[in-house]
């Protein structure tokens, strides 16, 4: 029934209970199989476990839970006897309670009548009440695969009046649309309705919600999840929040099944997946990337011809809108010796890392170009790195590509984390989450540095980054991913990182997965060209002969497997005859009496064929023939009553050869002391295979190689007939594991000690005295045997030595309590072992888990512990990981908002320090209808934004319960759920920091912060690391401008942030912190044809392009000011005159300082007049009947006069004029009968017609905008008096007062004060406050205004959505107009919608609004090493070229030619350098409302918005693509190769390549410079 939902080729997870296992059945416990790129290990037991019984710990959430049992025999009219369709019954039976199933008739209703999905006529269903959970089941007599029976859950709602009237016979009505399509039933169909009284048992485990083309941060995910609680959803249901955030339900899981519909409760985990994410592919370029597989395909070609096309196809099928970044990660080995000389776990000593950025944030629409670029770069990378130019110009080979096992894996992971270290970086409002995919030619085994491993794991605990490893090789026969490292004592360890998921790419038919393929690759041997015939001649191994006791081959195989893998548990004194009888079946010897007997084993002869002689040894513990490849973990038998708390330590499990006791003919236990041995330090890491392969080449024949292997094999065998095998046979000549060895301890330390066992029936006391009174058995949990047959233990505690700074002291302690669980804690509470180990376990399990023997398969329980701790909630329980593989690649998940991991109580009490602070809401916020609940929500919201997760689960409940003595029940909240009888309590955690937030009805919010104490600074233990980087358009590698290893997420001052959220932002101490920020510029573009003419008051006005764009900017500012955040009182009151008055933007042409010097008086008076004289006394108000002479006097000489100034526009100067918009504002302020701008325009046109004033060019009527008007000569006041008055007013202006009033723009009056008006502006304008405090000697001129606006004027959001806007007061139409946004807890999608509205408004007036980086361009490479840029040195240096060198010109403008080149190429001025603003001979300081400008270089923006350019002091140009805008403007869906890209897409690469070719072409550049020279000679005019 899932065929329609998931496509034809996707295999659904059955919704019907099945007794078959969820994973592939394997032959035995040690088997490993590869299925769809996933390594499946372990037994054939069903992975599904029995569901937890919640019992008495149900939360007091206000919803009463009823537990009962259904009785499906009471279906009306006979019904369907199999109604539950295999559903598990979880309810307890309540006698006498029967749940009826009602047959009903289906009807449909339209959305215009009701938005409810399902409605019932509750009169006909007496036991169903509004709000109950109800199940709807369809019925088909002959259900098919495409149209089977479906179950839909919904919340009961009664028919409304209109539905009752329209539905004559139907008693169930469903909303037409999605649900109707899913059910696929005609009207009046028969369905079944049944009450589900126990919501808690039926709630879904996981619900997956896909979003696209929007940024949904984790705070909003928490808010939206809370809105979905106590609702029902169905597959492919489209949901909308705030009428803006839209998503689709793509997965509903319960009890390991994917179901069609489900109920969402508080325990349901809602996972948000992104269809528009930022994907980063890091491709490891190692020596193996040029290797060929057995199929003849090169690994790199396998990646570009198989993996990438398949994943692009997946993206196209899902219709994703991702942006992708692809980089090569290379580690070059520059040492003189081969890496084979290094021991396992040892890193390269002399290496250099390179990162080549192939593409950066490119839309997947350009996938064809991406693949071509990828192939070209791979062809060039070898030549670029292996060839080194000598001083004489020769090219010599230098270094070699490192093997993948010795590559820079952790370094590249840290390189990827650099883009996420700042949680308040400028956001991409169209993409959610960042997903890293590392493509490796290896098989998941890496040698890493111990200190760097600790640092990397620590760093990733605080970042919201998902990471997948895709291996191009076949899956190995060991646990993956696997890291080898050497600790500070040079001991070798194997570990599995908990922050990395691994997949093996195999594009062949899935049937081939069932075929056996060799996993050991000896590439040099394979490439020697030896044919099969030559191989047969060199290595001649004859066939084996089976024991004649075996009657059939199948019987022999079954018995062998049973004996090998179903190891019996031998208790002391047990009868071992049965074991002896079974084992003797397979004991054989050589015919020539060469006896191989490592233990006392009864031998029986076998017949042989020909002269072949071989041995079958009974695999009592699957002991390898050549060496001890996998060491079974052993533990004492817990049935023994007295055991000391200190178990045997690490040296015994790692280096001792302890085998399962077997019985000899005398039924005696023998544990040969000679099994303990000590290896020399020089030989401790020698591997047989590695030793044999060293130096293997065509000069060393295969025959020699084979002889060496056989010699190694039999070197320790004593060929004497009657001699037993001596202790040298199992001397530790080889590694203890297939991948390496631990450094052994002295034999005196290797003895098992400290174990006092009391057991009767043990044999030989001599053996006991040597080994201790001990019975040992295998750790059978790793083979998946039932837990009741072995010790019940937590698999997560299967850990190795400590990885903290106290590693050497605590490593043994970790192993001693390796399998102690919560249930056994009471047995060992007498010692400190448990608490210390639990602390250690938690610390280690956050980042990695040590593995004793990587080749031993792990149990399913232990495999679950290998999931990333912070990401565990993403995966549904009981569902195989392979079902989520492609979802991780196509729709990566964001970090879940919840985490179930929490420190133990002992760890929490002992190892955390306590800090606390309290927060109360500022009373000023009450006028905006804010309460302490809103503050509490914002505090939690902000923590989720910075990576915190809400703690849930039993452990955090236990911690909270231990705090509340005397209370029988404790609730730790997940969502905002206030209970009158209880305080709100919520825990959040990130890395080693835990916050406990509590709030009661008093309104005081307490924050308790717990910080892990005595943590070593891991960043001090790792040296600096500067790799070489080559971005997309660079021609050579250079040093990176960032140290990827030492970049981390800084801790935040949460006390300060909480005070800011509460409304106390004026008292900030740390001025470096800021909220979220975005910068936009408005650029001129093509004007729509129908915009040139405008009809104003019935009169047609024709405007030129410049006037249209200026008018567009005024409309934009008007839209911003009308969005001012209002108090509740203002919202209820009438619209006032104040709202009709707009702040003026002063437009100018020519140099900025000329305009400021000319208009300084106007700039000062405009700020003062707008603030202080916004209203005059009612007695002085005029009306429309005023005489023109009196009106002229009031305008020019009244108290609230208009300043007449000389204005220059381009090259024309206009004497003593005013601007139309300025007159409109004056009329509204001073006339009692003019309340709107429209009224003011009509009156202005009237007095203009009467001759009061005229347009300076006699071109326009009176208009509201930037149009110049002059008074008619008869109405002009005395000039001398006017100038004297103006001068007097200028001297009265107080610079400090002007700073304070102008810095907040139009929001400085009380009506504009908002919750963040004193917060965000105060944060950003910190330098202004500092300057004010230092009593500046010069007046400060503010060139921008700020205003706090309401982003949600319709009130759709449940929280206040506000944002601070900074916009220019002074603007040149030939430059960029700037708008900056700052916010804290505002929903980003609402910001995006607001910007979209502004952008559409601009487009109507020939303007384009684009987003650019907030910081200046030169700082980007120091925070984002992936960002591409190019530095261009001009082909002509005009400062030195005789043709263009002009001292007079350069004295006025040193960069005249450079600026002309940029303008001629379509670049517009963005930011001026701070040096330019500070070094001029002026009488004031330049400031902005967002802070003091700190730009090092002048910056330009290309008119397309695609590129940003900087002009350096040396005359070079520094350019970088504006990725944040390019990814926004380009459509994201994939287009086929035969189709061209959309015409609306922006080809940013073409822009930069054309400009670069112009700058490097002498003739093109000379032509442009000649035009610039001619303009200078003609006009002698130099602009900014």
UniProtKB/Swiss-Prot annotation:
Residues 74-84 have a biased composition (Low complexity). Keywords: Membrane, Phosphoprotein, Protein transport, Transport, Vacuole. One of its GO terms (biological process) is positive regulation of autophagy. Residues 1-11 have a biased composition (Basic residues). PROSITE patterns: DEP (PS50186). Its main location: membrane. Residues 1198-1273 form the DEP domain. Pfam families: DEP, DEPDC5_CTD, IML1. Signal peptide: none annotated. It comes from the Eukaryota. One of its GO terms (molecular function) is GTPase activator activity. Belongs to the IML1 family. Component of the SEA complex composed of at least IML1/SEA1, RTC1/SEA2, MTC5/SEA3, NPR2, NPR3, SEA4, SEC13 and SEH1. This is Vacuolar membrane-associated protein IML1. The lineage of its organism: Eukaryota, Fungi, Dikarya, Ascomycota, Saccharomycotina.
């Amino acid at each position: 029934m899932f065929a329609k939902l998931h496509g034809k080729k996707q295999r659904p997870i059955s919704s019907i209970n099945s007794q078959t296992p969820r994973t592939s059945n394997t032959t035995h416990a040690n088997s490993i199989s590869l299925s769809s790129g996933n390594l499946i290990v372990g037994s054939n037991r069903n992975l599904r476990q029995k569901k937890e019984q919640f019992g008495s710990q149900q939360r007091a959430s206000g919803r009463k839970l009823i537990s009962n049992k259904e009785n499906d025999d009471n279906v009306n009219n006979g019904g369907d006897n199999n109604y539950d369709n295999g559903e598990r019954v979880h309810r307890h039976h309540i006698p006498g309670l029967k749940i009826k199933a009602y047959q009903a008739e289906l009807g449909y209703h339209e959305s215009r009548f009701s938005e409810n999905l399902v409605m019932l006529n509750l009169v006909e269903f007496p036991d169903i009440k509004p709000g109950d959970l109800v199940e709807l089941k369809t019925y088909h007599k002959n259900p098919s695969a495409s149209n089977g029976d479906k179950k839909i859950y919904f919340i009961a709602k009664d028919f409304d009046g209109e539905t009752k009237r329209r539905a004559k016979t139907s008693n169930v009505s469903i909303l037409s649309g999605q649900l109707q399509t899913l059910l696929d039933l005609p009207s009046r169909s028969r369905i079944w309705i049944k009450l589900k009284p126990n919501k808690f048992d039926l709630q879904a485990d996981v619900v997956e919600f896909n979003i696209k083309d929007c940024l949904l941060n984790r705070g909003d995910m928490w808010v939206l999840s809370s809105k979905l609680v106590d609702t029902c959803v169905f597959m492919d249901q489209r949901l909308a929040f705030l009428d803006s955030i839209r998503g689709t339900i793509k997965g509903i899981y319960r009890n390991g099944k994917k179901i069609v519909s489900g109920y969402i409760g508080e325990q349901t985990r809602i996972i948000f997946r992104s269809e528009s994410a930022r994907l980063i592919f890091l491709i490891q370029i190692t020596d193996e990337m040029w290797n060929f597989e057995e199929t003849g395909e090169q690994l790199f070609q396998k990646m570009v011809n198989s993996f990438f096309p398949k994943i692009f196809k997946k993206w196209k099928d899902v219709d994703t809108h991702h942006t992708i970044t692809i980089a090569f990660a290379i580690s070059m080995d520059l040492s003189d010796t081969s890496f084979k000389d290094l021991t396992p776990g040892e890193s390269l000593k002399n290496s250099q890392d390179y990162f080549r950025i192939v593409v950066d944030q490119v839309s997947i629409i350009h996938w064809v170009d991406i693949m071509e670029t990828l192939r070209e770069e791979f062809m060039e990378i070898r030549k670029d790195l292996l060839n080194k130019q000598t001083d004489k110009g020769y090219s010599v080979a230098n270094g070699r590509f490192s093997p993948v096992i010795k590559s820079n894996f952790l370094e590249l992971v840290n390189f990827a984390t650099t883009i996420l270290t700042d949680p308040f970086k400028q956001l991409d409002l169209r993409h959610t989450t960042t997903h890293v995919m590392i493509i490796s030619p290896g098989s998941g085994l890496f040698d890493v540095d111990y200190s760097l491993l600790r640092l990397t794991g620590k760093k990733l605990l605080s970042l919201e980054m998902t990471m997948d490893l895709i291996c191009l090789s076949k899956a190995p026969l060991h646990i993956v991913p696997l890291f080898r490292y050497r600790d500070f004592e040079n001991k070798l360890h194997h570990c599995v990182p908990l922050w990395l998921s691994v997949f093996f790419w195999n594009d062949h038919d899935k049937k081939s997965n069932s075929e056996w393929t060799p996993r050991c690759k000896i590439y040099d041997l394979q490439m020697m060209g030896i044919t099969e015939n030559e191989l047969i001649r060199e290595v001649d191994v004859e066939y084996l002969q089976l024991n004649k006791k075996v009657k059939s081959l199948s019987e022999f195989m079954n018995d062998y497997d049973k004996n090998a893998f179903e190891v019996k548990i031998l208790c002391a004194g047990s009868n071992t005859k049965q074991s002896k009888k079974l084992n003797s079946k397979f004991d054989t010897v050589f015919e020539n009496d060469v006896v191989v007997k490592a233990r006392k084993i009864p031998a029986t002869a076998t017949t042989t064929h020909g002269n072949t002689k071989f041995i079958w040894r009974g695999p009592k513990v699957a002991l390898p023939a050549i060496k001890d490849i996998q060491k079974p973990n052993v533990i004492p038998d817990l049935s023994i009553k007295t055991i000391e708390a200190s178990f045997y330590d690490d040296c015994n499990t790692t280096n001792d050869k302890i085998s399962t006791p077997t019985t000899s003919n005398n039924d005696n236990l023998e544990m040969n002391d000679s099994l303990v041995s000590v290896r020399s330090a020089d030989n401790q890491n020698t591997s047989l295979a590695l030793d044999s392969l060293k130096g293997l080449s065509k000069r060393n024949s295969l025959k020699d190689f084979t002889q060496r292997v056989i010699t190694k094999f039999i070197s320790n065998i004593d060929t004497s007939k009657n001699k037993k095998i001596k202790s040298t046979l199992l001397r530790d000549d080889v590694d203890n594991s297939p991948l390496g060895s631990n450094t052994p301890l002295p034999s005196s330390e290797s003895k098992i000690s400290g174990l006092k066992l009391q057991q009767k029936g043990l044999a030989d006391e001599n053996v006991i005295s040597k080994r201790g009174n001990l019975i040992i058995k295998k750790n059978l949990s790793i083979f998946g045997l039932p837990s009741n047959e072995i010790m019940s233990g937590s698999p997560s505690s299967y850990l190795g030595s400590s990885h903290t700074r106290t590693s050497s002291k605590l490593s043994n302690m970790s192993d001693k309590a390796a399998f102690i669980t919560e249930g056994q804690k009471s047995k060992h509470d007498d010692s400190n072992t448990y608490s210390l180990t639990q602390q250690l376990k938690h610390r280690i399990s956050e980042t990695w888990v040590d593995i004793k023997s990587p080749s031993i398969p792990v149990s399913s329980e232990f495999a679950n512990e290998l999931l990333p701790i912070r990401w565990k909630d993403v995966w549904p329980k009981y569902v195989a990981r392979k079902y989520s593989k492609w979802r991780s690649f196509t729709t990566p998940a964001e970090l879940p908002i919840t985490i179930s991991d929490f420190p133990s109580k002992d760890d929490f009490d002992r190892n955390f320090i306590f800090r606390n602070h309290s927060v109360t809401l500022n009373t000023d916020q009450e006028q905006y209808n804010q309460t302490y609940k809103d503050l509490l929500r914002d505090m939690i919201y902000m923590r989720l934004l910075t990576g915190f997760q809400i703690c849930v689960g039993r452990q955090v409940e236990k911690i909270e319960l231990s705090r509340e003595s005397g209370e029988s029940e404790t609730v730790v909240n997940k969502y905002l759920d206030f209970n009158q009888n209880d305080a709100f309590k919520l825990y959040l955690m990130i890395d080693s920091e835990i916050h406990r937030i509590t709030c009661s009805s008093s309104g005081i919010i307490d924050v308790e912060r717990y910080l892990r104490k005595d943590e070593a600074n891991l960043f001090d233990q790792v040296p600096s690391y500067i790799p070489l980087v080559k971005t997309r358009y660079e021609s050579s590698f250079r040093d990176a401008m960032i140290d990827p290893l030492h970049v981390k997420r800084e801790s935040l001052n949460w006390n300060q942030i909480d005070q800011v959220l509460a409304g106390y932002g004026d008292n900030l101490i740390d001025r470096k912190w800021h909220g979220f920020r975005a910068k936009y510029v408005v650029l001129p573009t093509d004007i729509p044809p129908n915009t040139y003419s405008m009809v104003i008051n019935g009169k047609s006005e024709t405007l030129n392009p410049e006037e249209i764009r200026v008018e567009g900017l005024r409309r934009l500012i008007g839209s911003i000011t009308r969005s001012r955040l209002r108090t509740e009182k203002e919202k209820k009151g009438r619209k006032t005159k104040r709202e009709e008055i707009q702040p003026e933007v002063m437009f100018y042409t020519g140099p900025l300082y000329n305009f400021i010097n000319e208009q300084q008086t106007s700039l000062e008076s405009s700020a003062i007049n707008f603030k202080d004289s916004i209203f005059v006394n009612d007695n002085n108000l005029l009306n429309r009947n005023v005489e023109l002479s009196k009106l002229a006097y009031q305008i020019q000489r009244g108290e609230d006069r208009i300043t007449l100034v000389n204005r220059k526009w381009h090259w024309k100067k206009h004497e003593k004029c005013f601007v139309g918009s300025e007159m409109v504002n004056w009329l509204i302020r001073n006339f009692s009968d003019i309340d709107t701008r429209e009224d003011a325009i009509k009156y202005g046109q009237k007095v203009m017609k009467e001759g009061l004033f005229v347009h300076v060019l006699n071109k326009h009527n009176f208009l509201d905008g930037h149009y110049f008007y002059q008074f008619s000569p008869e109405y002009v006041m005395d000039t001398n008096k006017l100038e004297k008055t103006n001068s007097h007013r200028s001297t009265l202006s107080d610079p400090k007062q002007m700073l304070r009033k102008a810095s907040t723009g139009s929001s400085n009056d009380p009506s504009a004060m908002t919750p963040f008006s004193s917060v965000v502006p105060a944060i950003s304008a910190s330098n202004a406050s500092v300057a004010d405090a230092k009593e500046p000697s010069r007046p400060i001129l503010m060139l921008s205004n700020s205003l706090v606006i309401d982003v949600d004027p319709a009130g759709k959001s449940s929280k206040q959505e506000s944002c601070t806007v900074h916009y220019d007061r002074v603007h040149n139409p030939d430059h960029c107009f700037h708008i900056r946004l700052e916010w804290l807890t505002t929903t980003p999608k609402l910001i995006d919608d607001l910007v979209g509205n502004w952008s559409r408004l601009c487009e109507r007036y020939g303007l384009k609004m684009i987003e650019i980086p907030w910081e200046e361009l030169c700082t980007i490479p120091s925070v984002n090493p992936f960002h591409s840029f190019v530095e261009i040195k001009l082909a002509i240096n005009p400062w030195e070229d005789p043709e263009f060198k002009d001292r007079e010109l350069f004295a006025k403008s040193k960069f005249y030619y450079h600026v002309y080149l940029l303008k001629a190429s379509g670049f517009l001025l963005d930011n001026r350098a701070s040096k330019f603003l500070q070094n001029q001979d002026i009488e004031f300081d330049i400031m902005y409302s967002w802070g003091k400008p700190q730009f090092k270089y002048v910056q330009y923006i290309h008119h397309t918005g695609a590129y940003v350019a900087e002009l350096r002091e040396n005359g070079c140009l520094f350019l970088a693509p504006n990725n944040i805008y390019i990814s926004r403007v380009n459509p994201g869906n994939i287009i086929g190769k035969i189709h061209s890209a959309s015409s609306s897409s922006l080809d940013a690469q073409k822009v930069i390549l054309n400009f670069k070719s112009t700058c490097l072409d002498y003739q093109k550049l000379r032509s442009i410079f000649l035009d610039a020279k001619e303009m200078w000679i003609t006009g002698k005019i130099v602009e900014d």
